[in-house]
Amino acid sequence: MASSEIHLIALKLVKYSDRQSILTAYSLEAGCVSLAIPMGAGKAASRTRALTMPLSILTAVADVEGKREIPPLRNPVPSPPLCGVNSSPLKQMIAMFVAELLSVLLKESQPDEAMFRFLVSSIQILDCADGREVANFPLAFLYNLARQAGIEPDRSTYRVGSVFDMRDGLWRDTVPLSHHDYLGTEESRIAATVSRITMENMGRFDFSRAERNRALDLMLEYYTMHYVSLRNLKSLDVLRSFV
């Protein structure tokens, strides 16, 4: 099949040889893909590397359905440029965390237009966010991603004083008897608060750093139980120091 235009979200760039790096990206047309990009010192190679920073949104040309195991990426163009992310160290750190998380979650994924549109919209929101919106973005993103992935907790079950059952993804009036994967009442209350967060209202939530980090840990553990293990994310510790 001839090369054609594809729409990409850059996730991870790894050096493959002195001449090539491998870009892992999530595409509208083919799901998760690996693409070869040049590693030279020339302007074209430098520009391509700059355009493939974590969470960059691109259009490019590649033969993702051909016989080549790792097809080359050609003619990448930002769509749109992420000026806010590129100018903010905090947003860059969040982008690194989200990109690493997605490279694990979407590793074997097939094309999913709804997921791709959600990711593009979320990245554009991060690009324009400020203040408390930026600090709360990882929580808002993770919770709303759970909805896209089909593992969103049932927040309609929350009652004051209830406990959150991590296995079943709902709040209970009493602790489950068959396992110990549940939260105490205070953490269950925080979990219920997080369940109300959206990309539109995330700036209204006034979490302390300790609450934010604990909520982040619990959400990653929830994903690990219901989707895929997220216990070894290298960017997590650095993210904690930022938010």
Placement of each model-derived feature along the sequence:
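Non-catalytic alpha-helical scaffolds and adjoining flexible linkers that form interface surfaces
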Residues: M1-I22, Y26-V243
